[in-house]
Amino acid sequence: MTSLSRPRVEFISTILQTVLNLGLLCLGLILVVFLGKETVHLADVLFAPEQASKYELVEGLVVYFLYFEFIALIVKYFQSGFHFPLRYFVYIGITAIVRLIIVDHKSPLDVLIYSAAILLLVVTLWLCNSKRLKRE
């Protein structure tokens, strides 16, 4: 098997990075559209007189924050030199589990397990932000 020359490897890397960047840019634009749709949906739910609409409003707010966090993750990717910071994924995980607790809270054992998962993610976030793992 022949080894690839350094310029060829850099060219392939550049092509793949460009494809990744374009894909993330498209994903970011799609998320902005969904964020706009969620804003309109939240406005509709806000003025609905039903009692059930309050739960739908809270769920919609958490989904709104999920869209917002994914968009912030993509922005941070471009700002940090094409690198995804781990803590943003942890934030998204915590928000997603909180949404799950709000939507599906019928089983107390499930809520306890979800809460333990949130605690684990918070500890992970604390460890990632500690000085031992801090990247300069």
From Swiss-Prot:
One GO BP annotation of this record: cellular response to phosphate starvation
> Which regions face the Cytoplasmic side of the membrane?
1-14, 76-81, 129-136
Q: Establish whether keyword Protein transport is in the entry.
A: no
UniProt-listed InterPro entries: P_starv_induced_PsiE, P_starv_induced_PsiE-like
Matching entries from Pfam families are given as:
PsiE (PF06146)
Entry's transmembrane regions: 15-35, 55-75, 82-102, 108-128
**Lineage top rank: taxon:** Bacteria
What cellular component terms from Gene Ontology apply here?
plasma membrane
Establish whether keyword Cell inner membrane is in the entry: yes
Could you say which protein family the record assigns here?
A: Belongs to the PsiE family.
Protein name in the entry: Protein PsiE
Q: Can you name the source organism?
A: Escherichia coli O157:H7
Q: Which gene encodes it?
A: psiE
